[in-house]
Amino acid sequence: MSAAGTGKKVFIKTFGCQMNEYDSDKMADVLRAAEGYEPTTDVEQADLILFNTCSVREKAQEKVFSDLGRVKHLKARGVKIGVGGCVASQEGAALIERAPYVDVVFGPQTLHRLPEMLARRDAQQRPQVDISFPEIEKFDHLPPARVDGATAFVSIMEGCSKYCSYCVVPYTRGEEVSRPFDDVLTEVASLADQGVKEVTLLGQNVNGYRGRMGDTAEIADFALLLEYVAEIPGIARIRYTTSHPNEFSQRLIDVYARVPQLVNHLHLPVQHGSDRILSAMKRGYTSLEYKSSIRKLRAIRPDISLSTDFIVGFPGETDDDHARTMKLIEDVGFDHSFSFIYSARPGTPAAALHDDAPRELKLARLQQVQEAIEANGRRIGQSRVGTVQRILVEGPSRRPELNAGHELMGRTECNRIVNFAGPARLTGQLIDVTITEAYPHSLRGEVLLRERSPQPA
């Protein structure tokens, strides 16, 4: 039953990963359907303020409490405040003790209960906390998504069962639970019917997907799911994130040869180049095994773009360990990375490890990692100049100085942003552009005129 037209507004601030972005969209959908809330980007106009949090790094966690303090004054006019996501899951009722003006605390698996929690808050006149792990229940209680554009996220699983020594995800999101195979396909088909051309399949470890097929006992793995998603009419591109190298199997690699909709880009977190550190992280593979997987993939897709994650300054990291990370970067040729200094998370095994490396050394190592990968990115970007790239046009350029000139932006298969001049009617379309310039984090192109088309690269 729709509750549209109430005039109530919700402000949602999202921290962290794409899973959180997806969850924030679902919070908005749930609140719109149940209570008529409409999203706002102006916190001062909100009747409800939600922070969807991340606890992967200490800085992100502390920023949540800083932001809470900044909106506390809005309670005077009856605004409700909620905290969801991984910090909420980790802190639970302790969050209320630290910020007693918070009305609701909910975990990633209980966001669908938001309307009920808010109602109980009013009825009982006390804060509500629900950070339970009701497996995949939330997907059965979410209203249909409202599509805005030609791209969409689709969550295919929740949680992680890898228990890396530094990571809180298994404790904040629970162990791996896969959505039923048919449920995922139904959602993707619905999105395609609404004009979506590109889907990004989400999970903490998507290649660990094991979804039940219909009413049978059969289980679909991630490779099979990709093949079925590719058969859905209208889906031109498939992305996924995040993966774990342990389950980047030959069966999954072979899908790249059979499914052209699978984009020419892979994000595969390696975290470190030293086998000694990888073992301490409990990652379960060696740098050689990681490179072997990449070599097999490049035998099928020679020009695939690769991005990754690196943790610098893990307890006990030596100069030799760091040198091995730099060698891995050189050997693999990553296009992009998310690189951070290690941040001890309470309750994880790594938090008990002795860490005596000075922060200045860690910062220097981080800079070396980032500079090496940025150099790779610049080289790869320059190599695209003069080539033809197919891009999916997402909308106006995000660079303010270009918007006055009616600039648009889109992404290549390799996830490079391309800015170009063109009419707004191209939004949502797949078009060919000739790349004319390369910048550190984007490309510039011209819409290809068919009558004078160069050969695609």
UniProtKB/Swiss-Prot annotation:
Does the record carry Magnesium as a key word? no
Domain (MTTase N-terminal) ranges: 8-123
Name by which UniProt lists this protein: tRNA-2-methylthio-N(6)-dimethylallyladenosine synthase
* Record field: catalytic activity: N(6)-dimethylallyladenosine(37) in tRNA + (sulfur carrier)-SH + AH2 + 2 S-adenosyl-L-methionine = 2-methylsulfanyl-N(6)-dimethylallyladenosine(37) in tRNA + (sulfur carrier)-H + 5'-deoxyadenosine + L-methionine + A + S-adenosyl-L-homocysteine + 2 H(+)
Q: What is its EC number?
A: 2.8.4.3
State the species of origin.
Answer: Methylibium petroleiphilum (strain ATCC BAA-1232 / LMG 22953 / PM1)
Q: Give the domain of life.
A: Bacteria
Name any cofactors this protein relies on: [4Fe-4S] cluster
What GO terms fall under cellular component here?
A: cytosol
Q: Does the keyword Cytoplasm apply?
A: yes
Instruction: Domain (Radical SAM core): give its ranges.
Output: 146-379
> Per UniProt, which keywords does this protein have?
4Fe-4S, Cytoplasm, Iron, Iron-sulfur, Metal-binding, S-adenosyl-L-methionine, Transferase, tRNA processing
**Main location as per UniProt:** cytoplasm
Q: What does the cofactor field's note say?
A: Binds 2 [4Fe-4S] clusters. One cluster is coordinated with 3 cysteines and an exchangeable S-adenosyl-L-methionine.
**Residues in domain TRAM?**
382-449
* Residues making up the signal peptide according to the UniProt record: none
Location in the cell reads: Cytoplasm
- Lineage summary: Bacteria, Pseudomonadati, Pseudomonadota, Betaproteobacteria, Burkholderiales
* Primary role: Catalyzes the methylthiolation of N6-(dimethylallyl)adenosine (i(6)A), leading to the formation of 2-methylthio-N6-(dimethylallyl)adenosine (ms(2)i(6)A) at position 37 in tRNAs that read codons beginning with uridine.
CDD domains attached to this UniProt entry: Radical_SAM (cd01335)
Q: Which positions in this protein are listed as binding [4Fe-4S] cluster 2?
A: 160, 164, 167
Q: Write down a Pfam family by its short name.
A: Radical_SAM
